[in-house]
């Protein structure tokens, strides 16, 4: 009979850990949380010191009964849930749900599921860390306060299936703010001017870029200015004024944190944050490897630390020495510096054993699991390697009073780039043809002027949103992926070609939250709340202080919104469309996916159809109405009502005015009207409305 009971979170770990520990240990899984706040009520009483009321999660009764049977048999119980706040809270709930007060109970944690790590954790068993538990409990209660109090209010007042969340509402606002920036952006014209010059004795010309005058750097803002510069240099002598040789190093990247893994997997592998975390969970919990059984391939996946254990540092140094050579090794990598709290009981995400090279286990892993493992393996090896080294040359060329420059680089030593390159590492070397000496004269061949327009800020992708959330202090490693998944699932945002767009539903929800609950969607407020939760974890802040300060203000805001938001209840709006089934005038209704037309004769008549909002502008192709439409994923655009017969379509709202230069439609962008033809580039201010 087993003398010791080990309780883990995931059933996927049970077999592996039991194999490590032997017959004296019984290993069972809690399958996540076993207790939570009740769904049907707030779950705590503000009048009684905010003490939470936890109940057994529906469906967990039989599991707890099985665990209690094993508890009775065991001399010692080891709570081995995940090594973070959530895991600590699950251990605490297990302690009370299983009534372990009279038993010998120990908390153990490990950052990787390997035999050494699991056995070492038994030697370092400790008590449950109540600071971690309190931090998780405070987060859970804050999230419950926002969701339970605000979501029903928005649903009742707006009638669109809206709901709110403490972190998700801020993430939505970040995306909405970017959308506003993009819509208000006015492109500005600028020009580049390259000159092709021939070096004496060389066949291939070199290309230098316009810099400015001998007095200052300057840009070119129009074709006329570019033409003027070229005309002024007609017959001019192009002379090399300065040649500088130097060196440049490109440092190795840091090993992955949760955030950087999600970003890189999105950019390189085109994985969603949710998919990345699902696959990383499998790699952490264990994969069947021929000859070894189930093996945990990476360390714990929810971390904001770049720290690496001494054992892993030693193995990396030895591995690099053997496979790449002494010169590829580097001193201990500089660790991530951050003013915010980093949960440094954790390590960076890394392979548990570098000798399990990706190519050696490729055939034993599904394709996407292999690709993610390879990415993590290469990134970690590269992070322990020396910098790449380049020889650089910069050249200044003068013609009359105008300056052109060129820069060239040649890789001298590849360092970490022999293993791993990121998107921004993939720069082509610009090698000078021949030697350039100061005061040498170059033969002019041609100018190459090009027109450009400034670009608006890019739409957020999942990767850049995660980066923004991390930089702003919104959420933590465990919340990035669930937050994005939630606002996508609720159709507040839509994803097209990796880009995230706000839907009409998202716009309405964000506007209402800004109006009624400005602090909830305030980035700084939310970041400060995260910092306070970190303070609870560190033992410097009491959890009840946070919730007791937060709830009264929220309660007051909800009561105020119940009065103020009453006026924005949306009544059915009558349309010009007549129901072809019963002859009634159809009304505009609102559903989870936006507006649609419905017959007011419901339930006798159940006719519905898509709603297209006419904007009062004629299609330039066929003369019929232009209407506002939505893509399948909810992004707004403007197209001909006669689609698919007519394919006219633009992303910005047509104004009805025509461009005085080219005759095409002018589109509304912020307080400007811009020509729909970017090559035309015409821009003017919107007419001021008369009061």
What residues fall within each predicted segment?
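Core structural elements
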Residues: 139-149, 167, 197, 248-260, ...
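Basic, low-complexity terminal or inter-domain segments flanking catalytic cores
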Residues: 2-4, 16, 25, 97, ...
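C-terminal or mid-to-C-terminal helical accessory/interaction module adjacent to the motor/catalytic core
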Residues: 113-195, 245-246
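Intrinsically disordered, low-complexity regulatory segments
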Residues: 1-137, 211-212, 220, 227, ...
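Metal- or metallocofactor-binding catalytic centers and their adjacent structured scaffolds
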Residues: 215-254, 440
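Short acidic, hydrophobic short linear motifs in intrinsically disordered regions
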Residues: 240-243, 251-265, 292-301, 456-468
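Alpha-helical scaffold elements adjacent to nucleotide-binding pockets in ATP/GTP-utilizing enzyme cores
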Residues: 16-20, 66, 89-97, 117-121, ...
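Conserved short loop/turn motifs at secondary-structure junctions
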Residues: 82-83, 159-163, 245-254, 266-269, ...
């Amino acid at each position: 009979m087993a003398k010791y009971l080990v309780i883990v979170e995931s059933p996927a770990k049970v077999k592996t850990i039991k194999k490590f520990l032997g017959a004296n240990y019984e290993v069972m899984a809690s399958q996540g949380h076993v207790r939570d706040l009740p769904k049907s009520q707030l779950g705590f009483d503000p009048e009684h010191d905010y003490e939470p009321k936890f109940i057994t999660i529906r469906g967990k009764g039989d599991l707890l009964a099985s665990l209690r049977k094993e508890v009775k048999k065991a001399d010692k119980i080891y709570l081995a849930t995940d090594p973070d706040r959530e895991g600590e809270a699950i251990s605490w709930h297990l302690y009370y749900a299983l009534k372990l007060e009279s038993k010998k109970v120990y908390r153990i944690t490990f950052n990787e599921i390997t035999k050494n790590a699991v056995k070492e954790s038994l030697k370092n068993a400790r008590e449950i860390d109540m600071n971690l538990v309190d931090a998780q409990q405070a987060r859970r209660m804050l999230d419950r306060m926002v969701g339970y109090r605000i979501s029903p209010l928005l649903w009742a007042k707006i009638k669109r299936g809206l709901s709110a969340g403490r972190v998700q509402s801020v993430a939505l606002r970040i995306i909405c703010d970017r959308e506003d920036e993009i819509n208000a952006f006015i492109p500005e014209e600028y020009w580049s001017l390259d000159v092709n010059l021939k070096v004496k004795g060389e066949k291939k010309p070199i290309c230098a870029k316009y810099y400015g005058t001998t007095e200052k750097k300057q840009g070119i803002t129009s074709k006329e200015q570019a033409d003027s510069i070229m005309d002024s240099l007609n017959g001019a002598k192009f002379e090399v004024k300065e040649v500088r040789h130097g060196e440049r190093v490109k440092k190795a990247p840091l090993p992955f944190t949760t955030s950087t893994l999600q970003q890189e997997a999105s950019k390189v592998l085109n994985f969603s944050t949710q998919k990345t975390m699902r696959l990383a969970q499998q790699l952490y919990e264990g994969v069947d490897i021929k000859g070894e059984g189930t093996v945990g391939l990476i360390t714990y996946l929810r971390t904001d630390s770049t720290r690496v254990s001494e054992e892993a540092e030693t193995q990396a140094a030895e591995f690099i020495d053997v496979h790449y050579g002494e010169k590829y090794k580097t001193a201990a990598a500089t660790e991530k510096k951050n003013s915010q709290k980093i949960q440094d009981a954790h390590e960076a995400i890394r392979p548990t054993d570098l000798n399990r090279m990706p190519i050696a286990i490729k055939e034993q892993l599904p394709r996407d699991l292999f690709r993610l493992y390879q990415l993590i393996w290469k990134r970690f090896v590269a992070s322990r390697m020396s910098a790449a080294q380049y020889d650089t040359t910069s050249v200044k060329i003068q013609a009359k009073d105008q300056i052109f420059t060129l820069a060239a680089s040649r890789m001298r030593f590849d360092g970490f780039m022999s293993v791993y390159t990121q998107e921004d590492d993939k720069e082509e070397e610009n090698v000078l043809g021949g030697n350039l000496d100061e005061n040498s004269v170059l033969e002019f061949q041609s100018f190459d002027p090009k027109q450009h327009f400034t670009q608006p800020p890019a739409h957020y992708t999942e990767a850049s949103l995660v980066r923004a959330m991390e930089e702003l202090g919104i959420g933590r490693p465990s919340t990035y992926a669930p937050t994005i998944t939630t606002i996508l699932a609720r159709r507040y945002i839509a994803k097209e070609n990796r880009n995230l767009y706000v839907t009409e539903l998202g716009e309405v929800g964000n506007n209402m939250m800004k109006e009624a609950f400005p602090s909830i969607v305030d980035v700084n407020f939310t970041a400060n709340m995260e910092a306070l939760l970190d303070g609870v974890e560190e033992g410097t802040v009491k959890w009840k202080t946070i919730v007791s300060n937060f709830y009264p203000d929220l309660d007051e805001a909800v009561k105020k919104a119940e009065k103020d938001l009453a006026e924005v209840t949306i009544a059915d709006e009558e349309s010009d469309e007549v129901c072809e089934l019963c002859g009634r005038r159809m009304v505009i209704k609102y559903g989870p996916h936006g507006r649609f037309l419905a017959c007011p004769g419901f339930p006798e008549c159940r006719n519905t159809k898509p709603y297209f909002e006419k904007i009062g502008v004629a299609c330039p192709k066929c003369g019929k109405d232009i209407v506002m439409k939505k893509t399948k994923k909810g992004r707004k655009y403007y197209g001909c009502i006669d689609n698919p017969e007519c394919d006219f379509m633009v992303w910005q709202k047509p104004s009805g005015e025509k461009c005085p230069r080219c005759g095409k439609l002018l589109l509304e962008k912020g307080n400007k009207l811009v020509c729909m033809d970017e090559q035309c580039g015409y821009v003017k201010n919107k007419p001021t409305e008369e009061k």
